[in-house]
Structures are given as structure tokens and as C-alpha cells.
Design a protein with these regions (language model features):
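NAD(P)H-binding glycine-rich loop region in Rossmannoid oxidoreductase-like domains
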Residues: 39, 43-115
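N-terminal Rossmann NAD(P)H-binding glycine-rich loop of SDR-like oxidoreductase domains
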Residues: 6-26
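Residues at the starts of beta-strands that form the adenosine-phosphate
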Residues: 5, 29-30, 157
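Conserved glycine-rich Rossmann-like NAD(P)H-binding loop of the short-chain dehydrogenase/reductase
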Residues: 28-39
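C-terminal catalytic/substrate-binding lobe primarily of soluble NAD(P)-dependent oxidoreductases
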Residues: 22, 151-377
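Rossmann-fold NAD(P)-binding glycine/threonine-rich loop
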Residues: 107-129
Length: 377
């Protein structure tokens, strides 16, 4: 049973520890949960800032519904950072529901998000609990841009792009878990929203995104489809939403695109255990260990949304830094609202819809993590 109101599940992982950083910064007590208490303690001592001033406990548990339910009981909010979420997320979602906890996670995996909506959305709603996947840089920044665009009357069609800069000659500075999620995209369908229906992207889909922030177009991919088409499918303001992701100053997207096409041609019909081995090999070869903490001089982001109506058009842009550090900040911003019992929506929802895009943007702006601009077109 959790001693404190917030549980961070996956506390020895990169994103979990950055979430803990921000909880400590906001003086929020927490229960750090992982499969190995020893590893959680060791990693937190190495990586977590201001740990000496924190109020917390460390709990070891197995990754089962029964075990996690017992650990989550007593808490109000669970921050789940254990991925790939397609593989591990549903167990934590079921456990949080049984324990009577709100659930935030950091996924960007559209297939998982769709599964959460269908399997748990109504149950969380009836329980008065928030189920908010993708409470993270990907794709809350793009959704903030989309919401800013939707402030213009008449906008009903959205195109969004999430453009990131990381390590120039490496795997874009992503974590081991993120890399596993990326290669795992080859196994699932990717969708965009068209006339209120989710439509599958072709396997070969790619975009050359043009933005005035850059001299050259940025090669981008659907990247599982992102969470935005799912969130906006049930939003009466939006008829269509197409989203993409690109890494500028880095060729990683072209490598990923090649892998996805190779998967379609050679691997898609192999037995599951063979596919698992292929994905593990790809992850190990590109991201063998936890990356260092992000630097503001290296990790910079541009997320924008172009909104169009019959006669209106607008472009909203969110400039940001340090995507994973910003993810920890977004988790903590959401936790702060939930601990005070403040939410605009329960059940399956996005962070923007539950807590307000203006609140999230303000939280980021005041901590030097993002700024936004809006331009009428």
C-alpha cells in the first residue's frame, strides 16, 4: 500500500526519474515503485536532483495486476512510465483502476492509446477517475499548439508536426524504452483522422514538413499516428487531424522508415518470438544504455499546428527544449491539479482536455521550457 499520494511506476527509468525531479521541485511526496528496490535506490542516488530534500518511499513489486493494485492502493495518482506501453501498459491501467487511482502515462503509441480508450475509458469515467495517456512532450506540446489554433473560430481541420533536435550523430537521444516503442511501431497500424473516422496510413507514408524555422524540409513519419487523431475523434470542433514527427539535424527518421519498409517486406509474417528478437536486436544496436541527461544547448523542439476552416486559417507554434525533462514537468503539472481535485473531464482524456492547455502552457513557460506564438494565415 502506497504511503504517499503519488506513485511513480518505473522509478528507476529515465523518464520516471525526471518525473521524480519535478515532484521534488514542487514539494510533492511520492512512492517510487519498480521491479527492484535496490536498482531504484541506486539510480535515484545517481540521477535524481535534490533527493536529499525529498519525502518518499521505495517499493518493490512484480508487474502483475494483483501486485500493482496492492502497491497503488492508498495513492491518488499513478504516473506510469513503464514502456513499451503496448506491451506493459494495460496491466498498470487495470491495477490503477482497481486501486481507485487516476492514471497518467507518457506513451506516444497510438495502438495502445486506442486500446486504453476502448478497454478502460468508460470504467474510469464511471469511477470518476482520469485516464490520460500521452501526458508527455509527445504529444502534449503538439496538442497545446492545436488547441491554440482551435481558438480561432471556424477551425475544424488540423495538421500537426512534432519536430525534435537531439544528438546529431546518434539515435536522436531517445531512451531505451522509447527506442523499443519506436521499432515496435512496425507491428501496428497507424491512423489519421479524416471526416471523424480513423483512416490507416500506408506503410510507406512519409512527409516533407516545411516550416519557417528551418532552411530545409524536415523528413517526418506518422510515428504510430500519434495520440492526437484519437483525442480529436470525439471532439465536436474537429473533423480531420493528420500528425507527423520528425528529427531535424539527424537522419534517424530515414533509418526508421527503411526499417519499417523492411519489416513489411520481410518480417511481418514471422512468428512473434522471431519478431521480438528482431526488435530487441534493433534496440540493442541503436540504444544500448540509458542516455545522459538532456542539455538545453542540444535538445530543442518545434511543434506546430496548422488549423483551417472554410475561410479561416491559423498557425500555432510551440518552441521548447529538453523533451524528456518537459515530460516530467507535464506529469507534475497534471499531478498538482489532480491532488487538488481539479479536472475538467474524467475517463479517457488528454492532459489538455483534463487540465486546460493554457494551464499546461503556463506551467511550461514559467519554468523556461516552452513558449508559444499564433499567426493568422
Amino acid at each position: 500500500m502506497a504511503k504517499y499520494p503519488v506513485v511513480v511506476y518505473g522509478a528507476s527509468g529515465y523518464t520516471g526519474m525526471l518525473t521524480i525531479d519535478w515532484l521534488i521541485d514542487q514539494n510533492i511526496p511520492f512512492t517510487a515503485v519498480g521491479r527492484s528496490a535496490k536498482r531504484v535506490e541506486e539510480m535515484m542516488k545517481q540521477r535524481v536532483v535534490r533527493l536529499e530534500s525529498a519525502t518518499y518511499e521505495i517499493v518493490e513489486t512484480e508487474h502483475t495486476v494483483e501486485a500493482l493494485t496492492k502497491v497503488f492502493q492508498g495513492a491518488k495518482v499513478v504516473c506510469n512510465t513503464v514502456g513499451p506501453f503496448v506491451q506493459y501498459g494495460a496491466i498498470a491501467a487495470e491495477a490503477a483502476l482497481k486501486a481507485g487511482c487516476h492514471l497518467l502515462d507518457t506513451t506516444g503509441e497510438q495502438a495502445y492509446i486506442l486500446d486504453m480508450r476502448e478497454r478502460f475509458g468508460e470504467s474510469y469515467r464511471q469511477a470518476g477517475l482520469v485516464l490520460a495517456p500521452s501526458t508527455s512532450y509527445m504529444y502534449s506540446f503538439a496538442e497545446i499548439a492545436a488547441e491554440l489554433a482551435l481558438e480561432t473560430p471556424g477551425i475544424d481541420c488540423l495538421e500537426t508536426a512534432t519536430l525534435c533536435r537531439g544528438t546529431r550523430f546518434a539515435a536522436a537521444g531517445v531512451t531505451v524504452g522509447s527506442t523499443a516503442s519506436i521499432f515496435g511501431m512496425a507491428r501496428v497500424k497507424q491512423h489519421y483522422l479524416w471526416e471523424k473516422k480513423l483512416v490507416e496510413h500506408p506503410v510507406t507514408a512519409s512527409f516533407n514538413v516545411v516550416d519557417p524555422n528551418f532552411m530545409e524540409p524536415v523528413f517526418s513519419l506518422p510515428w504510430s499516428g500519434t495520440s492526437l487523431p484519437v483525442f480529436y475523434q470525439t471532439d465536436s470542433r474537429v473533423r480531420s487531424c493528420i500528425s507527423s514527427v520528425g528529427f531535424y539535424d539527424n537522419d534517424v527518421m530515414k533509418l526508421a522508415h527503411g526499417f519499417f519498409q523492411k519489416w513489411e517486406a520481410e518480417f511481418k509474417d514471422l512468428p512473434a518470438e522471431h519478431q521480438d528478437a528482431i526488435i530487441k536486436g534493433a534496440v540493442d544496436s541503436t540504444t544500448p544504455s540509458m542516455p545522459p541527461r538532456e542539455r538545453t544547448t542540444t535538445v530543442r523542439t518545434v511543434d506546430f499546428a496548422i488549423g483551417r476552416g472554410q475561410l479561416s486559417a491559423v498557425r500555432a507554434t510551440v518552441h521548447g527544449i529538453t523533451a524528456y525533462i518537459s515530460t516530467g514537468a507535464l506529469q507534475t503539472a497534471a499531478v498538482t491539479k489532480l491532488l487538488d481535485g481539479e479536472t475538467n473531464k474524467v475517463g479517457f482524456t488528454s492532459a489538455c482536455k483534463a487540465f486546460g492547455h493554457s494551464y499546461l502552457l503556463g506551467f511550461l513557460e514559467q519554468r523556461g521550457l516552452a513558449r508559444a506564438t499564433v499567426q493568422q494565415l
